Amino acid sequence: MPVHEIRHPLIRHKLGIMRRADLSTKSFRELSQEVGALLTYEASKDLPLAESTVEGWCGTVTVEKIAGKKVTVVPILRAGIGMLDGVLSLIPGAKVSVVGVARNEETLQAHTYLERLVGELDQRLALIVDPMLATGGSMLATIDMLKRAGCREIRALVLVAAPVGIKAVLDRHPDVHIYTASIDDGLNENGYIMPGLGDAGDRIFGTKQKAE
């Protein structure tokens, strides 16, 4: 099953704190990074390993290292930036591809306004990070872009997801695995995830939050 709802106690606890409406920008931002790191741990569990040797304090030691898998982290602007440092804390050597996708608040349709992708995407695992998977429009636009550029292995890391967004992604891209801290109930009339987290971008950057 390509949908992974990670119900680890640490993730459940941290996500519960993030749902508080009175949480400070600083705390929300820090928790976004922490949950992003925990999702990265789950999403990278099957990376291949190869044996190598290092000189240890008592002589040569056989160790394991990640083998032959280049990684690019793909934050969807702007809210995806809030999860980026959490991912890089575990995979510091990953290259970063940046994608800007905006949603029309009337039609809820996504349009791309920025594309800065790293090279050799055909040899890379792409980890897309975005706090919210709501209608799926931004995620679909990003996946489409990566595949056009030659990327063959894509995983999405989101804090909360709505069933309609998950279905939209899997209907078009059944090969993409989705890792989320929570599958929430659905969307309200404005396209916000319920109960969700509110506007994650506003909460991460401390800008004015839109009414739901």
Curated annotation (Swiss-Prot):
Matching CDD domains: PRTases_typeI (cd06223)
Native source organism of the sequence: Bordetella petrii (strain ATCC BAA-461 / DSM 12804 / CCUG 43448)
Cofactor: Mg(2+)
Domain of life: Bacteria
Pathway(s) where this gene product acts: Pyrimidine metabolism; UMP biosynthesis via salvage pathway; UMP from uracil: step 1/1
Signal sequence coordinates: none
InterPro entries: PRibTrfase_dom, PRTase-like, Upp_B, UPRTase/APRTase, Ura_phspho_trans
Protein name per its UniProtKB record: Uracil phosphoribosyltransferase
Documented activity regulation: Allosterically activated by GTP.
Entry EC no(s): 2.4.2.9
Keyword annotations from UniProtKB, A to Z: Allosteric enzyme, Glycosyltransferase, GTP-binding, Magnesium, Nucleotide-binding, Transferase
Role played: Catalyzes the conversion of uracil and 5-phospho-alpha-D-ribose 1-diphosphate (PRPP) to UMP and diphosphate.
Binding residues for uracil: I193, G198, D199, A200
Catalytic activity from the UniProt record: UMP + diphosphate = 5-phospho-alpha-D-ribose 1-diphosphate + uracil
GO molecular function: GTP binding; magnesium ion binding; uracil phosphoribosyltransferase activity
Keyword Glycosyltransferase: yes
Similarity comment: Belongs to the UPRTase family.
